[in-house]
């Protein structure tokens, strides 16, 4: 049985934008961002300048810096007004207060554990099914994740950023893997092989 989070996510964003000043400022920053399309290597590339993202994109993620800070994804350290939507018994989806696109979520594992995808493809796939109008991101610990010490995924609306479009063209060397199929167990098995 498919389970959709779409309506719950929309309600959460509406509610949290009113109750949580940090998210309200982040959404305002997103509305004020500058976006244009540039042509590069025969492809259209979406370029977006989002000044409010500087805190996240410049976060210190070295071992010493991480050891000196509280994990901002652990439930005990979340903003008291921050609310989430439980997902699949081990995760909770929260509004990302530093959004890059519409409906930007951070989906956080209940336990403080390292950012590792191994063994998590089933949850990743369930998220993709529950958020069909979004794309799901796993950002590795050495690939830009600002919280390499706590397992999490992110999701954003596909509306502005059709991530799957260019990977379908011949001659394009993908930095994204796109797997499709009707058998979830087979998809999880294939993902574990990557």
Region locations from a protein language model:
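Active-site microenvironments that recognize anionic phosphate/pyrophosphate groups
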Residues: 1-124, 134-146, 158-179, 184-194
């Amino acid at each position: 049985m498919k389970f959709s989070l779409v309506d719950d996510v929309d309600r959460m964003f509406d509610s949290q934008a009113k109750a949580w000043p940090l998210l309200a400022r982040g959404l305002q920053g997103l509305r004020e961002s500058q976006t244009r399309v540039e042509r590069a290597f025969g492809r259209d590339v979406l370029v977006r300048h989002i000044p409010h993202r500087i805190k996240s994109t410049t976060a210190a993620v070295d071992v010493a810096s991480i050891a000196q800070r509280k994990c901002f994804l652990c439930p005990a350290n979340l903003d008291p007004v921050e609310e989430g939507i439980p997902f699949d018994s081990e995760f909770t989806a929260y509004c990302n207060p530093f959004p890059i696109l519409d409906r930007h979520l951070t989906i956080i594992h209940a336990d403080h554990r390292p950012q590792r995808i191994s063994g998590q493809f089933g949850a990743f796939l369930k998220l993709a099914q529950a958020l069909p109008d979004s794309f799901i991101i796993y950002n590795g610990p050495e690939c830009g994740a600002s919280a390499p010490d706590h397992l999490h995924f992110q999701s954003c609306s596909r509306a502005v950023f059709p991530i799957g479009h260019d990977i379908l063209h011949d001659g394009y060397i993908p930095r994204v893997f796109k797997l499709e199929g009707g058998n979830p167990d087979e998809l999880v098995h294939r993902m574990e092989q990557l």
